[in-house]
Every structure is written in C-alpha cells, then in structure tokens.
C-alpha cells in the first residue's frame, strides 16, 4: 500500500513539473517573435480605421529581447530602428512592457507605447499614442 502511494505521488510530481516550464514561454524569460495581425489608427475626432502596418511605418514582425531590453524589427536595420523596453512587469497573467520612441529625428512624431502579452497564450495588444493620434495593434507572440 505504501509503495502504491509513493508511485502515485511520484506520478503526480511528474505531471505537475512540466506546467511551469510551458507557462514560462511568455513571462519574459525567453526572447519572443511578435507578429502584428490587425492595426487600428484613431484620430482626435473619435474616428478609427483599420490600416496596414506598412502604412504607419510599422514592421509586421518584431524580435523582443528581454535580456537586452530591446525590441527589433525583423528584416530591417536592428540598431537604427530598435526601441528600448523601459518598464517590464507581470500583472494579472500579462507581461506588460512600456517605453517611448522619438521616431524620425526633427519630426514631431514621438509616441509612448505599452504592450500586454498574455502569459498563457502569447496573444498581445500594443498601444501607442502621440500628438493627435493613437494606434492599437493586435498580434501574437511565439518563443524564439
């Protein structure tokens, strides 16, 4: 009877151990690839419209490097277009990233941004706001 209980306990431990490993994909411990799926642009009059990532100079794919605290567009000059992750927190099952980007030098196009990544699924929402404009980007992340 004791042997059966020990085998049952060992089996239970084997089942429990892998779950934190799987959940760790979207907690900031591994680099991620983010794909922008839907992009919405809103103006001060309350009108919003769906736009393509290219129409707002947004790459469709980004590498998120948590160790370097950088986000790089994939397939473009990484140093020139990278942005810094200035704040990172785990809140209510979401990894929240925040930062600010100056954009093009000499042009008043800077934005503040926040990205929320669901720890369980990797689905993500990126919001960015600037002068008289706001953007919402729906997408998904996958571990690299």
List each model region and its residues.
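Sec/Tat signal peptide C-region and signal peptidase I cleavage site
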Residues: 19-23
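C-terminal partner/receptor-binding element of secreted or periplasmic proteins
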Residues: 132-144
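Short, exposed beta-strand-loop hairpins at the edges of beta-sheets
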Residues: 116, 124-135
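Short, solvent-exposed coil/turn segments at beta-strand boundaries
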Residues: 64-70, 91-94, 114-124, 143
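Positively charged n-region of N-terminal signal peptides that target proteins for export
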Residues: 1-6
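Short, solvent-exposed loop/hinge segments that bridge or flank secondary-structure elements
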Residues: 28-70, 108-109
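Bacterial N-terminal signal peptides
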Residues: 7-18
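Contiguous, well-ordered beta-strand patches that form the walls/edges
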Residues: 67-109
């Amino acid at each position: 009877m004791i042997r059966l209980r020990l085998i049952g306990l060992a089996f239970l431990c084997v089942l429990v151990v892998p779950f934190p490993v799987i959940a760790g994909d979207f907690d900031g411990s591994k680099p991620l690839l983010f794909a922008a799926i839907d992009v919405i642009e809103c103006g001060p009059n309350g009108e919003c419209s769906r736009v393509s990532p290219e129409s707002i100079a947004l790459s469709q794919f980004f590498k998120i490097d948590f160790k370097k605290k950088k986000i790089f567009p994939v397939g473009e000059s990484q140093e020139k277009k990278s942005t810094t992750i200035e704040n990172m927190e785990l809140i209510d099952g979401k990894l929240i990233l925040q930062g600010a980007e100056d954009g093009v030098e000499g042009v008043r196009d800077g934005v503040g941004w926040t990205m929320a990544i669901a720890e369980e699924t990797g689905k993500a929402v990126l919001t960015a706001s600037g002068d008289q404009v706001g953007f919402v980007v729906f997408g998904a992340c996958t571990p690299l």
